[in-house]
C-alpha cells in the first residue's frame, strides 16, 4: 500500500484504464488485472475516504457485483463507476482554466492535491507543465504581495480581497489598490520572478538585515508610483512585471548610491578626526619632551 490521497488513487486508476472519457462527474473504468491495478483498487476499497466515490451497484468483478468491496484475490477484470469529487479544488479539472476559476487559487493558495485532465498532471507528479508552474509562481507572488500590503480591503460587494499599498512623501500620501487574480491570458506572459518580493517579507528579514526596512519601503513606494502612473490593474502589473522590477532596481540603486556616498563622507570625516587627534597627541608629547 502507498500513502496516496483518495484523489491520487482515483487518478492512478484513471490512468491504468487508459484515461477514458469522463461523463460529467461520473467515471466508468474497465480494468484488467495487473499488480499496479490490484494495488490501486485495494487502496480504493479499503479506504473509507476513497471508497465513498464508488457508485453503488456499479462495481463488477469477473461478472459478479461486489457488494462489500472485498476484492477477491486472483481477479481477472473489473468494471467500476466512480463519482468524482466536486466539493473543493481537490478534484479533476478539465483544463488549467478550470483550476484558476477557484477563488482560493486567485487569492494565492496553490492547491496541494488536484488533477488537470487535458495535461494529465497530478500535483504529486515529478514533471510540472509550464502552465501549472506559472500558476504556482503567480500564487507565490500574490501571497508575498499580500504580506507586504499595508492592509487588505474586503469591503467590496464581491467579497474579493484588495491589497492596499500606501506611499508617503512630503507630508502627503498616495495609495494603490490591487485585486489579485489569475487569468488564462496571464499564462502566456513571461515567467514571473517572485524571489525579490518573497525576500522582502517579514518572515524572511533575518536572511537580509542590510537595509531590509528601507528596501521594503522602496518596493512599496515604487509599486504605488508605477501603478498610478500607468493606471495598471493586477493583470497588467504581471504583464509588465519585468519593467516594474527594473523601476524598483533603479530606485534601490539610487538609494544605495546615496547611502554609500553618505557613509564614505562619514568615514573620511572620522579618519580626519582620528588623524587630527593622533597628530595633536604626537605634538603634545614632543613639546613635553622638549620642555623637559
Question: Where in this protein do the model-derived segments appear?
Answer:
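Long, contiguous, compositionally biased segments that the model treats as domain-scale units
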Residues: 1-127
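Polar low-complexity intrinsically disordered regions
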Residues: 1-3, 145, 283
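Transmembrane alpha-helical segments and their cytosolic interface motifs
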Residues: 262-292
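Short, charged cytosolic
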Residues: 243-268
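Glutamate identity and glutamate-enriched acidic tracts
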Residues: 12, 43, 52, 56-58, ...
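Extended, non-transmembrane interaction/recognition domains
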Residues: 68-250
Amino acid at each position: 500500500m502507498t500513502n496516496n490521497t483518495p484523489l491520487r488513487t482515483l487518478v492512478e486508476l484513471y490512468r491504468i484504464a487508459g484515461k477514458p472519457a469522463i461523463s460529467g462527474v461520473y467515471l466508468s473504468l474497465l480494468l484488467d488485472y495487473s499488480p499496479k491495478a490490484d494495488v490501486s483498487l485495494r487502496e480504493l476499497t479499503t479506504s473509507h475516504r476513497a471508497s465513498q466515490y464508488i457508485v453503488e451497484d456499479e462495481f463488477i468483478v469477473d461478472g459478479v457485483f461486489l457488494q462489500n468491496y472485498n476484492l477477491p484475490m486472483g481477479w481477472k477484470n473489473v468494471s467500476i463507476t466512480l463519482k468524482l469529487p466536486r466539493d473543493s479544488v481537490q478534484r479533476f479539472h478539465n483544463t488549467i482554466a478550470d483550476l484558476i476559476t477557484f477563488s482560493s487559487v486567485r487569492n494565492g493558495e496553490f492547491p496541494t492535491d488536484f488533477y488537470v485532465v487535458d495535461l494529465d498532471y497530478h500535483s504529486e507528479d515529478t514533471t510540472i507543465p509550464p502552465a501549472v508552474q506559472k500558476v504556482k509562481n503567480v500564487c507565490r507572488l500574490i501571497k508575498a504581495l499580500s504580506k507586504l500590503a499595508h492592509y487588505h480591503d474586503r469591503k467590496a460587494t464581491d467579497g474579493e480581497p484588495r491589497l492596499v499599498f500606501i506611499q508617503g512623501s512630503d507630508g502627503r500620501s498616495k495609495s494603490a489598490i490591487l485585486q489579485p487574480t489569475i487569468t488564462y491570458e496571464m499564462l502566456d506572459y513571461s515567467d514571473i520572478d517572485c524571489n525579490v518580493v518573497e525576500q522582502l517579507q517579514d518572515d524572511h528579514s533575518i536572511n537580509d538585515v542590510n537595509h531590509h526596512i528601507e528596501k521594503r519601503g522602496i518596493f512599496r513606494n515604487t509599486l504605488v508610483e508605477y501603478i498610478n502612473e500607468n493606471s495598471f490593474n493586477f493583470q497588467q502589473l504581471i504583464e509588465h512585471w519585468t519593467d516594474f522590477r527594473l523601476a524598483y532596481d533603479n530606485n534601490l540603486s539610487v538609494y544605495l548610491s546615496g547611502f554609500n556616498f553618505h557613509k564614505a563622507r562619514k568615514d573620511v570625516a572620522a579618519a580626519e578626526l582620528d588623524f587630527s587627534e593622533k597628530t595633536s597627541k604626537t605634538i603634545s608629547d614632543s613639546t613635553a619632551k622638549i620642555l623637559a
